[in-house]
């Protein structure tokens, strides 16, 4: 106890630091993952069902492969639409920024 703090105070300081570190870890982990749409969640559920059926022997490997490919094709269609929408919205935002900078 050279620092002048009692052992209880030292323990509280340590636990407060640990809580702060845990909060920082939680915040960064939430930022790392993209937001999932309902369609994305449904796709994940379908893929999980395919794996479940495959592992339980209800479908063959070839059937599972075909189902995964079908799901992926459907996902690609949705993803390409999303990218197109983002590209259009970015162009609009850039135009607005340019107009503001010209006026200002």
Swiss-Prot record:
Localization, UniProt: Cytoplasm
Q: Does the keyword Transferase apply?
A: yes
> What does the record give as EC number?
2.7.7.6
Gene3D superfamilies of this UniProt entry?
6.20.450.10
GO MF annotation, one: nucleotidyltransferase activity
Predominant location: cytoplasm
Q: Where is the composition biased (Acidic residues)?
A: 7-31
Q: Which reaction does it catalyse?
A: RNA(n) + a ribonucleoside 5'-triphosphate = RNA(n+1) + diphosphate
What Gene Ontology terms describe where this protein resides (cellular component)? Answer: cytoplasm; DNA-directed RNA polymerase complex
Enzyme kind, highest EC tier:
transferase
Q: Which InterPro entries does the UniProt entry name for this protein?
A: RNA_pol_Rpo13
Keyword terms of this UniProt record: Cytoplasm, DNA-binding, DNA-directed RNA polymerase, Nucleotidyltransferase, Transcription, Transferase
Is Amino-acid biosynthesis tagged as a keyword? no
> Positions of the region Disordered?
1-33, 78-104
- Give residue spans, biased composition: Basic residues: 80-104
What assembly does the database describe for this protein?
Part of the 13-subunit RNA polymerase complex.
User: Which family does the entry's similarity section mention?
Assistant: Belongs to the archaeal Rpo13 RNA polymerase subunit family.
Sum up the protein's function in the record's words: DNA-dependent RNA polymerase (RNAP) catalyzes the transcription of DNA into RNA using the four ribonucleoside triphosphates as substrates. Probably binds dsDNA.
The molecule here is called DNA-directed RNA polymerase subunit Rpo13
Originating organism: Saccharolobus solfataricus (strain ATCC 35092 / DSM 1617 / JCM 11322 / P2)
């Amino acid at each position: 106890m050279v620092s002048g703090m009692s052992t209880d105070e030292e323990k509280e300081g340590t636990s407060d630091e640990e809580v702060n570190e845990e909060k920082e870890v939680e915040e960064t982990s939430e930022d790392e993952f993209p937001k999932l749409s309902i369609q994305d969640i449904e796709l994940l559920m379908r893929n999980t069902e395919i794996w479940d059926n495959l592992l339980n022997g209800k479908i063959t490997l070839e059937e599972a492969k075909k189902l995964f490919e079908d799901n992926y094709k459907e996902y690609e269609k949705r993803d390409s639409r999303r990218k197109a929408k983002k590209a259009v919205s970015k162009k609009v935002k850039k135009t607005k920024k340019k107009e503001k900078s010209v006026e200002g």
